[in-house]
């Protein structure tokens, strides 16, 4: 499901790479864990898989390059610090992501998760008005809403 080939990422050309020549395969139906000490490149690898960083190498998700909408619909990433559009309401954020990922029935799917996460009363709030915990819940709702084959939480 996720295939990483020869991933190399340098943040500064004068320093050693954060990740050098990493290859891995995470198969469908399996739980894959990146384990290592601080500074080993775990977060850099995950952010590269999620296509949040520029890198060298190749990353495929469900057979698609990780920068394609097809790949993004297969894999959801919930970052430690939620990355939301502060000027959008919860409902507007849901609509934006639902349309961007071409999710059929995204409103109905989101409604189920909003109820499950006890977020229905926050629908009209701007993302910047939400507490850190509520922002994290919204990030998870967005990740679940696209119904991917894999998650990174």
Name every feature range the model reports, one short phrase each:
Residues 126-133:
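Conserved ABC ATPase signature
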Residues 140:
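Hydrophobic anchor residue at the start of the ABC signature
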């Amino acid at each position: 499901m996720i295939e990483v080939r020869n991933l190399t990422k340098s943040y500064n050309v004068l320093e050693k790479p954060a990740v050098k020549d990493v290859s891995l395969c995470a198969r469908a139906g399996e739980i894959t864990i990146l384990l290592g000490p601080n500074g080993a490149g775990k977060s850099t690898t995950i952010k590269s898989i999620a296509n949040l960083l520029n890198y060298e190498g190749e990353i495929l998700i469900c057979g698609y390059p990780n920068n394609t909408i097809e790949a993004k619909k297969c894999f959801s990433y919930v970052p430690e610090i939620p990355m939301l559009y502060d000027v959008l309401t919860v409902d507007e954020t849901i609509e934006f992501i639902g349309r961007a990922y071409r999710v059929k029935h995204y409103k109905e799917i989101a409604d189920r998760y909003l109820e499950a996460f006890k977020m229905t009363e926050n629908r009209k709030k701007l993302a910047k008005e939400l507490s850190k915990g509520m922002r994290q819940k919204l990030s998870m709702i967005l990740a679940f809403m696209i119904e991917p084959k894999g998650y990174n939480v």
